[in-house]
Design a protein with these regions (language model features):
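Loop/turn-to-beta-strand initiation segments
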Residues: 58-59, 89-93
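H-loop/switch region of ABC-family ATPase nucleotide-binding domains
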Residues: 95-97
């Protein structure tokens, strides 16, 4: 929870009856004026504080698009927190469409710390219309998918623009 407080620059305080505030060293704010990404961090902190998430004891943590509404600067610390929870026995299942979250997972995964991240890419077969699942242990082995294609298109466009159309 200290890591979460460090990310947010303060602590979420739960008074009961639904009243939640965010407290820094000098001020206290209604959680309603906090950015959504910080509120997500506060919720994670609260789940840990109450024991709803107990690494190695509680069931899996399912989190759909944890990066949604998150300040991009907070993505790396979020991944570090998730990996630390995992190292302590918490199974975490994420769904994302975000290249940067995937890349931070790839860069911060440490096999020496026995990190185990498995990537699953879902796609629709264009002929049979069946859903395919490709599962790999290495980010670089993920088959081409909408995330990698969109990021590749963006990169190609930026390179083309910066080179003034050379090579066309």
């Amino acid at each position: 929870m200290d890591e979460i407080e460090k990310i947010c620059g303060g602590k979420f305080v739960f008074y009961g009856a639904g009243k939640v505030t965010f407290k820094t060293n000098n001020e206290e704010y209604s959680v309603n004026v906090m950015a959504e990404g910080f509120r997500k961090a506060g919720l994670l902190s609260r789940l840990l504080e109450t024991g709803a998430i107990r690494p190695g004891i509680s069931g899996p943590l399912f989190w759909d698009e944890p990066e949604a509404n998150l300040n991009p600067k907070l993505m790396q610390p979020l991944v570090e927190i998730l990996l630390e929870l995992s190292r302590n026995g918490q199974q975490i299942i994420l769904a994302t469409h975000n290249y940067f979250l995937l890349k931070w997972l790839d860069l911060l995964t440490n096999k020496g710390k026995e990190d185990h991240v498995r990537y699953h890419a879902l796609s629709c077969d264009p002929v049979t219309k069946e859903i395919r699942v490709d599962s790999v242990d290495n980010y670089h082995q993920i088959s081409s998918n909408a995330i990698s294609e969109a990021f590749g298109d963006l990169t190609d466009f930026e390179i083309d623009r910066s080179m003034g159309g050379l090579g066309r």
